A protein has these predicted regions:
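S-adenosyl-L-methionine-dependent DNA methyltransferase catalytic core
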Residues: 1-122
Length: 122
């Protein structure tokens, strides 16, 4: 739904290298993970969205890197969240963050538990 800058797309040589390492044709959509050993796994979901310390190289459908907005969406950030930092910093923010919907769910359960505890004291 957004215009992806050409800088996010892999070169033809890099795409061919990754496709030649695959044993089967991956599903679409998929997130490709390349680990430090060069093993490439293709999954219909992202199992690792890590900060800069990770070697994992995430690629959408074997064609391009995730945009800053896409990484933050995976963590539950709303599209209204303003991104005014470089790509490398956005990757760290997304990789080190806690999923927003998870925090909301936990906070809601904590509030319920506190309400129940307070109503029992009366």
């Amino acid at each position: 739904d957004e215009d992806i800058p050409t800088s996010y797309f892999l070169s033809e040589a890099m795409k061919q290298k990754r496709f030649s390492a695959l044993k089967t044709i991956p599903p679409k959509p998929s997130i490709w993970h390349e680990n430090i050993g060069g093993n490439i796994s293709t999954l219909p979901y992202s199992c690792a969205l890590r900060a800069g310390g990770s070697y994992n190289y995430l690629v959408v459908n074997g064609e391009r890197r995730l945009t800053s907005r896409e990484m933050l969406r995976l963590q539950g950030f709303p599209d209204s969240f303003i991104i005014n930092i470089p790509y490398s910093q956005a990757r760290k923010v997304a990789g080190n963050s806690v999923s927003v919907p998870v925090v909301q769910a936990i906070a809601g359960e904590m509030i319920k538990a506190l309400d129940e505890q307070n109503s029992c004291k009366i």
